[in-house]
């Protein structure tokens, strides 16, 4: 089990200890670190809704270091990013692959960033299913619908033609931070705050 550092904050009321993530949440920073899955999505969504309730006018900062993960969990985060009033600024630190790259590109226009040594990877959704032939066919049709929808949305976020994004996501497509900027996945590569 990972050790989560604690930070102590001094105020006129005395001292208060926070775990580091709670302290950063006070600064409106949310971490998407690791595989995108339902439990993580639930926490990120709750944090976004909390921060919106605290101040609907101030930006939220989503820091991403993710190999990707479950499409439906990622879409729940994506829909919440679009549902809430505050802009969500995204920052890739480390890697943003698959659903991580999709969420990175979905940040507010002009507020999508990557650190200089970050890696971004886009591809088509992955899936697998076992069972009766008819059920396999149903699941295959569903993943093709998801592929079309994700490609269309990424094309919108990147200001790229649908056909180009469809072609570029046929296989794993790795990019440096500068290449991700040129593609339109992010707006800038940042080295300092």
Curated annotation (Swiss-Prot):
Pfam families: CLP_protease (PF00574)
Name of the top EC class for this enzyme: hydrolase
Subcellular locations according to the entry: Cytoplasm
HAMAP family named among the record's database cross-references: ClpP
Biological function: Cleaves peptides in various proteins in a process that requires ATP hydrolysis. Has a chymotrypsin-like activity. Plays a major role in the degradation of misfolded proteins.
Family listed: Belongs to the peptidase S14 family.
Protein name: ATP-dependent Clp protease proteolytic subunit
Species whose genome carries this gene: Glaesserella parasuis serovar 5 (strain SH0165)
């Amino acid at each position: 089990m990972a050790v989560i550092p604690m930070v102590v904050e001094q105020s006129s009321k005395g001292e208060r200890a926070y775990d580091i993530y709670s302290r950063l949440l006070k600064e409106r920073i949310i971490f998407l670190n690791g595989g995108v899955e339902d439990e993580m999505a639930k926490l990120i969504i709750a944090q976004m809704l909390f921060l919106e309730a605290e101040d609907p006018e101030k930006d939220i900062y989503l820091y991403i270091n993710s190999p990707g993960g479950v499409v439906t969990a990622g879409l729940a985060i994506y829909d919440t990013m679009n549902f809430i009033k505050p802009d969500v600024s995204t920052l890739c630190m480390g890697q943003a692959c698959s659903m991580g790259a999709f969420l990175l590109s979905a940040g507010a226009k002009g507020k999508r960033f990557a650190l200089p040594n970050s890696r971004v990877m886009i591809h088509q959704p992955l899936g697998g299913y076992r069972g009766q032939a008819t059920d396999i066919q149903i699941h295959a049709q569903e993943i093709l619908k998801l592929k079309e929808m994700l490609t269309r949305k990424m094309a919108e976020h990147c200001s790229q033609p649908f056909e180009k994004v469809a072609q570029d996501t046929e296989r794993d497509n790795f990019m440096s931070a500068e290449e991700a900027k040129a593609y339109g996945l992010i707006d800038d590569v940042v080295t300092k705050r």
